[in-house]
Amino acid sequence: MSKPVKAAVFGTGSWGTAFGTVLADAGCEVTLWGRRAALADAVNSTRTNPDYLPGVELPENLRATTDAAEAARDADFTVLAVPSQTLRAGLADWTPLLAPGTVLVSLMKGVELGSAMRMSEVIGDVAKVGAERIAVVTGPNLAREIAARMPAAAVVACPDETVAQRLQAACHTPYFRPYTNTDVVGCELGGAVKNVIGLAVGIADGMGLGDNAKGSLITRGLAETTRLGVALGADPLTFSGLAGLGDLVATCSSPLSRNHTFGTNLGKGMTLEETNAVTKQTAEGVKSCESVLDLARRHGVDMPITETVVAIVHEGKSPVVAVKELMSRSAKPERR
């Protein structure tokens, strides 16, 4: 009888806990790592994560610890589920503890500020491992629905198809259906940019601009995501799949989406400070909109919706003025 797959999940937020639950339900032995002893104790004693997934029962083969070395020991997969802008510092601490040969799995959907690196690039840069040992999980995966064992599909991406298949097997359950892909660039960009477009759609919803505006933003948002991806060498077909359109639709249409909710509050007239105060978890698009725009400018890619989000979120531009400016841009063919 083969030994069970071991997985370490660094991050006890909603998505880290939800994906840890998927891995455990698929038969893995899962250890969650988090900084707060009280939360780790609650996971182990009550079988719930009261801070991020209250009311969701966690599997018996999932446990939590504050000891990073204990979590990382002998892990076949080391899953990274922390805010994207904190990854570099955290991984620098964890790298000496990693099990030999472990596959590093990114759940994060962002682009690093300053370097404009995708998360897999940050992982490779810090941990000094090859791309064949770095995988990405992405798609329309709202954490609370996954944790409630509601049906969902996802993409597991790695340049090495065999590694992608191993991860696929490790997280395949009756309610979670993963597909493999070798286009890591496209899969990561789809996840990072959809957070920005989710903010834009949320702002439009908060302003009461209607469903035509929402449909237009989603579609043109997908177009600028694809332009950026192609400029970076991604397969354009990736953006019509789960990592692109699938994730974008879920983020832009669900009240469970942090980015959509954040944008809605801004569109209703709340300040950035007020919106931050009522948001308990990270809305990745708030910081990633700047790094996505930086990445686009480095490659000469026009991303007007992303530019508009940056202007509203970080430059204090009125949403009303920003929408007027976006709508008054020079006319052009759709396929450009």
Swiss-Prot record:
Matching SUPFAM superfamilies, A to Z? Answer: 6-phosphogluconate dehydrogenase C-terminal domain-like (SSF48179), NAD(P)-binding Rossmann-fold domains (SSF51735)
Location in the cell reads: Cytoplasm
The entry lists its GO molecular-function terms as: glycerol-3-phosphate dehydrogenase [NAD(P)+] activity; NAD binding
- Any idea which residues are catalytic in this one? K194 (proton acceptor)
Q: Which coarse location class applies to the principal site listed for this UniProt protein? A: cytoplasm
Instruction: Report keywords, A-Z.
Output: Cytoplasm, Lipid biosynthesis, Lipid metabolism, NAD, NADP, Nucleotide-binding, Oxidoreductase, Phospholipid biosynthesis, Phospholipid metabolism
Reaction(s) catalyzed by this protein?
A: sn-glycerol 3-phosphate + NAD(+) = dihydroxyacetone phosphate + NADH + H(+); sn-glycerol 3-phosphate + NADP(+) = dihydroxyacetone phosphate + NADPH + H(+)
Give the Enzyme Commission number: 1.1.1.94
**Binding sites annotated in the UniProt record for sn-glycerol 3-phosphate:** K109, G139, K194, D247, S257, R258, N259
Class of the enzyme per the UniProt entry, highest EC level: oxidoreductase
Q: Where does NADPH bind?
A: S14, W15, R35, R36, K109, A143, R258, E284
Query: Among the entry's GO cellular component annotations, what is one?
Result: cytosol
- Offer one Pfam family short name for this entry: NAD_Gly3P_dh_N
Instruction: Report the protein name in the record.
Output: Glycerol-3-phosphate dehydrogenase [NAD(P)+]
Write out the function statement from the record: Catalyzes the reduction of the glycolytic intermediate dihydroxyacetone phosphate (DHAP) to sn-glycerol 3-phosphate (G3P), the key precursor for phospholipid synthesis.
Indicate the family of this protein: Belongs to the NAD-dependent glycerol-3-phosphate dehydrogenase family.
Pathway(s) served: Membrane lipid metabolism; glycerophospholipid metabolism
Q: Name one GO biological process term.
A: carbohydrate metabolic process
Report the Gene3D superfamilies cross-referenced here: N-(1-d-carboxylethyl)-l-norvaline Dehydrogenase, domain 2, NAD(P)-binding Rossmann-like Domain
